[in-house]
Amino acid sequence: RAIILKARQQGISTYCAGRVFWKTYFTPHARSVVMAHDSATSDALFNMSRNIIRNMDSLYKPTELRSNAKEIVISSPHFKKDATGEKPVSSYRLYTAGSPEAGRGTTPTIAHLSEIAFWQHDEKILAGLFQGISEAPGTEVILESTANGAQGEFYRLWRGALDGENEYTPIFLPWFTTSE
């Protein structure tokens, strides 16, 4: 579990999107969730995974069993057949944090939650999502955001991580670490 307080335009969201795709690609039965504060950002993060698949060499390219505006279901060439003779599948699902119920009822094994400090219903959405995420080995949660004042769930989780009061590893990436 990681919580990242970041500056803009450092490639952190791109890295996280790539990591989530990598975990989904190599983890049978992975259920990945990507959620951002607005639909344009959510779509951009989701399209990064589409571009990764599109640009993969055919030797490594996963089979897309379903692909639409909100979900990609893949079978990776790395997946081995299970006891029933079937190859497992993994999914990558897109949400936007526009409703207090966004993501509720899902059971992700991997979650990339972006710009949480700007979510309108941050407390309710995170409560619903966190109920469905197991503590089992292999699960992964990445919370990342630029700052938005000393308020809200992202701030509370960030302070808790700094104080060692929750399971998140705090990662601070200020603007001055990137030369422009």
Regions found by a protein language model. Give the residues of each.
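Phosphate/NTP-binding elements of NTP-utilizing enzymes
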Residues: 1-180
